[in-house]
């Protein structure tokens, strides 16, 4: 996908030794939904690092220290910011890979930027101007998830808010659109439309199969469709695929129905790489 922005340029965003570009080999953003413990996060990171080394796929590790938008007030939210950022910084140093986490208010921007490489704006917060500006002002790469309620062309306004800070290290993520109650669908037209901004586009395969609030006090989903949607996105052409994974998804504290079992990741990625090559051929 070679769509150019208004200035005719397709941006390449560099994060450490990883390069995001809509015409470059895809980057994997992967990890568990939330940080459950240091040992758990490091174990998942170690396995992903080994798999990606074997398959020659650039890796960014992701995990959340606080799931602030759980369906129920009783939902597990994570280990908290201070402990979570310490764990993420340790993973970055131990494996020499970029790390990503989400932020939820302007007070989290500066401390998170000191510990991680990519700050992620959750989909529900993608129009919060103060948060976007504060994130942009850190100078870190910003990954903004398109709201389930937002048209893909409206992400141009979101990108412009961050760019107004002078920060053009920006990724735009498609993660499904609301389709009635408790259901998301993926409109693959969104990928080339968002690429017209010139910024690298990410496809979030596992949240795209989420059923928000579909289990009453928790979100449901169907992980079996995530690899299928990821293959379709790579056939269109994207800079990155975002996949949440877990050693035992059915026992995960959040987003278990969507996450890919860790022991299935290598074969999943092997097939995704084939579609990436096909999508970017010629």
UniProtKB/Swiss-Prot annotation:
Catalytic reaction annotation: D-arabinose 5-phosphate + phosphoenolpyruvate + H2O = 3-deoxy-alpha-D-manno-2-octulosonate-8-phosphate + phosphate
An example Gene Ontology molecular-function term: 3-deoxy-8-phosphooctulonate synthase activity
Main location: cytoplasm
One GO CC term on file: cytoplasm
Coiled-coil annotated residue ranges, if any: none
GO biological process, one term: keto-3-deoxy-D-manno-octulosonic acid biosynthetic process
Database matches in InterPro entries: Aldolase_TIM, DAHP1/KDSA, KDO8P_synthase
Cellular compartments annotated: Cytoplasm
Pathway in which the depicted protein is active: Carbohydrate biosynthesis; 3-deoxy-D-manno-octulosonate biosynthesis; 3-deoxy-D-manno-octulosonate from D-ribulose 5-phosphate: step 2/3; Bacterial outer membrane biogenesis; lipopolysaccharide biosynthesis
Domain of life: Bacteria
Keywords: Cytoplasm, Lipopolysaccharide biosynthesis, Transferase
Family: Belongs to the KdsA family.
Protein name per UniProt: 2-dehydro-3-deoxyphosphooctonate aldolase
Organism: Granulibacter bethesdensis (strain ATCC BAA-1260 / CGDNIH1)
